[in-house]
Amino acid sequence: MTKAECRSWAFFLQKRRIHMARKLQLVSELANQTAHNITRDVDGWKQYLNTASRLYKYKFDEQLLIYAQRPDATACAEMELWNEKMRRWVKAGSKGIALIRGAETGRPHLEYVFDVADTRPVRGAREPYLWEMREEHYAPVLDALERRYGEGKEDEPGNRLMEIAAKAVREVYPEYLKELAYDAEGSFLEEFDQLNLEVCFRNTLTASVQYTLLTRCGFTPSDYLDDGELAGITEFSTPSVLHHLGNAASTEYFTPRELSVRF
């Protein structure tokens, strides 16, 4: 390679790095803006939870970006998984959903996933497994959850799910609460004393997990939850404090592999 070719290649690589850094910045800004949008009021938070209820395999930060770009997404995966494992080709012209990965290692970068709606089947194609609960599954699913979280007192399935979700949150919320207190500065939570901070976090987390579980299981959350029970979301007014709530809410409390039946 000549010196001129080396200089040209180096210029191309530098330009590419700048372009990628700019795209990463734009996606990061999108995540922050979406975090602000979904904590402005209860309706925004519920809209996010509706999407998150279908995306339990993803971390909160990724759920947030999927919601920002494709709120109607039902099953997302990388192109390689669709092509090689599922035998489904991504349709021409489909726009990938950008996710930020590698931040925990100090090397953040963008990776892209595609919703099943952006794919088409080819010979030997597999349908993605979409978690669904029908009425005949209530008893075995509730029994499986109660074996993990303890028996409840409620008889009606939706109320039993509410009770189970509250028990599950009580097991995990303390581990997230300490870190939340460190990051409360600059948010509406900053003015809360320790007791009120804990109450707000626990109650908002409980209602959020209940809403998500009810939605995932085909119930209408408004039949069991009032908007007032989710009103605490407006206190999580910075991305850093929302991050703690979102991570706690997206913990895999209830996933198909934890249950005794497959649908």
Residue ranges and their predicted role:
Residues 2, 8, 14-263:
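N-terminal accessory/interface modules of nucleic-acid-binding and processing proteins
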